Swiss-Prot record:
GO terms for cellular component: cytosol; cytosolic large ribosomal subunit; preribosome. This is Large ribosomal subunit protein eL21B. It comes from the Eukaryota. Keywords: Cytoplasm, Ribonucleoprotein, Ribosomal protein. The lineage of its organism: Eukaryota, Fungi, Dikarya, Ascomycota, Taphrinomycotina. It comes from Schizosaccharomyces pombe (strain 972 / ATCC 24843). Component of the large ribosomal subunit (LSU). Mature yeast ribosomes consist of a small (40S) and a large (60S) subunit. The 40S small subunit contains 1 molecule of ribosomal RNA (18S rRNA) and at least 33 different proteins. The large 60S subunit contains 3 rRNA molecules (25S, 5.8S and 5S rRNA) and at least 46 different proteins.
Length: 160
C-alpha cells in the first residue's frame, strides 16, 4: 500500500507532548489573555484534536488578528515559491503561546530609558546604541613557566 498523505501524516514526533508534560492540560493555558496585535508562537498540543492547525504552522510565529472565546486567529506569512503569502489560521488557545521573540528588545528599551533618565538628571549624554564587541587588547605572552610545545601530526598506520 502507498503511504498516507493525510493531514497529520508524519507527525509522530512533531505533535508529541514534552517530557513530563503528559496528562491534563494546565489551567494557566486557558487563563492567558490574547489581544489583537499580540505576537504568538504556534505549538501544537497533540492531546487536543479540536482547532489543531496544519503541521506546517507548528513552530511558526504570527500576529493575532482575531480573538474568540476559545480560539484566536493568527496571521502568518508563508513562503510559496518566490513570494510571501499571507495566511490566516484559526487556532484554539491550547495550540498557541505568547512569543518571547520581542522580550530582548523590550528589556533593552527599558534599560535604555533608565540610562537616559539617569543621564538627564546628571546633565550628561549617554551612548544608547549597541556597539560591536571590540577586538581583544594586545598583550605579551610570557614563556617563563610556559614552554612552547611543537605539535606534529601522528603518521597514519594501517592496522589489519
Amino acid at each position: 500500500m502507498p503511504h498516507s498523505y493525510g493531514i497529520r501524516a508524519r507527525t509522530r514526533y512533531t505533535f508529541q507532548r514534552g517530557f513530563r508534560e503528559h496528562g491534563q492540560i494546565r489551567l494557566s493555558t486557558y487563563l492567558k489573555t490574547y489581544k489583537v496585535g499580540d505576537i504568538v508562537d504556534i505549538k501544537v498540543n497533540g492531546a487536543v484534536q479540536k482547532g489543531m492547525p496544519h503541521k506546517y504552522y507548528h513552530g511558526k510565529t504570527g500576529v493575532v488578528y482575531n480573538v474568540t472565546q476559545s480560539s484566536v486567529g493568527v496571521l502568518i506569512y508563508k513562503v510559496v515559491g518566490n513570494r510571501y503569502m499571507e495566511k490566516r489560521v484559526n487556532v484554539r488557545i491550547e495550540h498557541v503561546k505568547h512569543s518571547k521573540c520581542r522580550q530582548d528588545f523590550l528589556d533593552r528599551v527599558k534599560a535604555n530609558e533608565a540610562k537616559r533618565k539617569e543621564a538627564k538628571a546628571q546633565g550628561k549624554t549617554v551612548q544608547l546604541r549597541r556597539q560591536p564587541a571590540p577586538p581583544a587588547t594586545a598583550h605579551f605572552v610570557s614563556t617563563e613557566n610556559n614552554e612552547p610545545v611543537t605539535l606534529h601530526p601522528v603518521a597514519y598506520d594501517t592496522t589489519i
